[in-house]
Amino acid sequence: MHSAANAKQQKHFVLVHGGCLGAWIWYKLKPLLESAGHKVTAVDLSAAGINPRRLDEIHTFRDYSEPLMEVMASIPPDEKVVLLGHSFGGMSLGLAMETYPEKISVAVFMSAMMPDPNHSLTYPFEKYNEKCPADMMLDSQFSTYGNPENPGMSMILGPQFMALKMFQNCSVEDLELAKMLTRPGSLFFQDLAKAKKFSTERYGSVKRAYIFCNEDKSFPVEFQKWFVESVGADKVKEIKEADHMGMLSQPREVCKCLLDISDS
């Protein structure tokens, strides 16, 4: 009886990283959630982390998000997961919400892009460009890749950008780890521009929560709050002294927020 009650209380958290990063960013949060008795799946999206595919093999946003879609497809029909998406990972969360709304108890966006069912999938990026200075990315590098007739745009995070805008509240060890493990990524802007927007009937039916990281210098808190004001969230949390990488600079606070959101 006791074990049955524990099983009922156990939740399954699926963690989705942002662009150029990987499942490794959750190395502090995953054991905290597991020690609280929960199941955790940290996903490496295509051509990210230790996923074996290369960026030049990934042609669409759906290709990029495929590992998350595979996890969602494997979830039993009677189970619901808690999704957590960080940064660009919020867009992959949106795809999972549109495709498998019945398998998600709540989708949590942390310093993340939040798709708007009333606008195109590129709308969040257009607003980011409006609200954030053009030199925000500092020494990050952008270049074309793939088919010369229809090239994609790749992005490599610059060490200065990472140190000053993403990991400024993290330990030097976490910053060094990130410099070693980041990979070229893409925002798949051209593909998203052609994609059908997410629906209010499916994407919009999933309960949403947002976690603000209030010392984020790459996703300023004003931009994060704009998502909540324009798209809406059922629950909102704020983590003080958290930079863009809140799961590394404030892992216990992120864990606490997640447990509170998932319990309500």
Curated annotation (Swiss-Prot):
Biotechnology: The strictosidine aglycone-producing AJM7-DeltaHYS yeast strain expressing pathway genes of the VOM module, RsGS, SBE (GsSBE, RsSBE1 or RsSBE2), RsPNAE, RsVS and RsVH, accumulates vomilenine. Additionnal expression of pathway genes of the AJM module, RsVR, RsDHVR, AAE (RsAAE1 or RsAAE2) and RsNNMT, leads to the production of ajmaline. Ajmaline is an anti-arrhythmic alkaloid commercially used as an efficient drug for the treatment of arrhythmic heart disorder.
Tissue-specific expression: Mainly expressed in roots and, to a lower level, in leaves.
Catalysed reactions, as listed in the record: polyneuridine aldehyde + H2O = 16-epivellosimine + methanol + CO2
Domain AB hydrolase-1: 12-122
Result of altering H86A: Loss of function
Propeptide: 1-6
Pathway the protein takes part in: Alkaloid biosynthesis; ajmaline biosynthesis
Swiss-Prot/TrEMBL GO biological process terms: indole alkaloid metabolic process; jasmonic acid metabolic process; salicylic acid metabolic process
Activity regulation behaviour: Inhibited by DEPC and HgCl(2).
Entry keywords, A to Z: Alkaloid metabolism, Hydrolase, Serine esterase
This enzyme's EC code(s): 3.1.1.78
Active site: S87, D216, H244
Enzyme class, UniProt record, top EC level: hydrolase
Effect of S87A: Loss of function
Record-listed 16-epivellosimine binding positions: S87
Record GO terms (molecular function): methyl indole-3-acetate esterase activity; methyl jasmonate esterase activity; methyl salicylate esterase activity; polyneuridine-aldehyde esterase activity
InterPro entries linked: AB_hydrolase_1 (IPR000073), AB_hydrolase_fold (IPR029058), MES/HNL (IPR045889)
Transmembrane intervals: none
Record-stated family: Belongs to the AB hydrolase superfamily.
Quaternary state and interactors: Homodimer; homodimerizes in aqueous solutions at pH 7.0.
Stated name of the protein: Polyneuridine aldehyde esterase
UniProt organism field: Rauvolfia serpentina (Serpentine wood)
Annotated gene: PNAE
